[in-house]
Amino acid sequence: FADEMTLTEYVDETNNFHLSYPTEWVLEKKAGATALFKNPSVKYASIGVTVTPVRIDSLKEFGSLEDIGAKLVEAESKKQTTVPGGTFMERQSERESVDTKTTFYEYEYRLITTHGNKRVYNYVGVRDRTLFIVNAQAYEIEEGGESEADEKTRALYREVGRSFDVLK
């Protein structure tokens, strides 16, 4: 990751959202993803957005911040590549977006997998019966994810997550 990452705004009027992403990254097409941004110099670093219609009007109808976080970690722990006992919720918080006042749940967790250790960042919100999910992930550069490069990745993904909002 570059020392100072320049961000570019991406607006998807069809799916009703916007976010900022690293300018050098490439927008790719992938089944199941509304938008997928990949770092051309780091193979498994990505930021994906999924937009899905739902029958609920708010995240609270699906569960509390903690309930959904627990379900998320449980689902990750059941994946074949996740080492038993290898899921760790690092942070979970709730925020209201600036433009539309949409409630977002934010999760950061660590996975120990058979392919290496990975950090995952999820930003989840519901507005107008539509579920919006931003999923950003990268493998740790150093065991424990505490290297300077890992810190920069963490700061970048948090900035991208904070930039995400539903269009008015």
What are these regions (language model features)?
Residues P22, T34, G69, V73, ...:
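Extracytoplasmic/secreted envelope proteins and their assembly/folding machinery
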Residues T14-G32, G161:
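Proline-anchored loop/turn motifs at beta-strand termini and strand-loop-strand connectors
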Residues F17-S20, D99, V126, K152-L156:
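Structural motif
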Residues T8-V11:
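Short amphipathic
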Residues W25, L131-K168:
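Surface-exposed amphipathic alpha-helical segments
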Residues N16, F62-E66, S147, E151-A155:
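Soluble non-cytosolic domains of exported or imported proteins
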Residues L19, V49, P84-G85, L156-R158:
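A general, composition-driven signal for non-globular sequence regions
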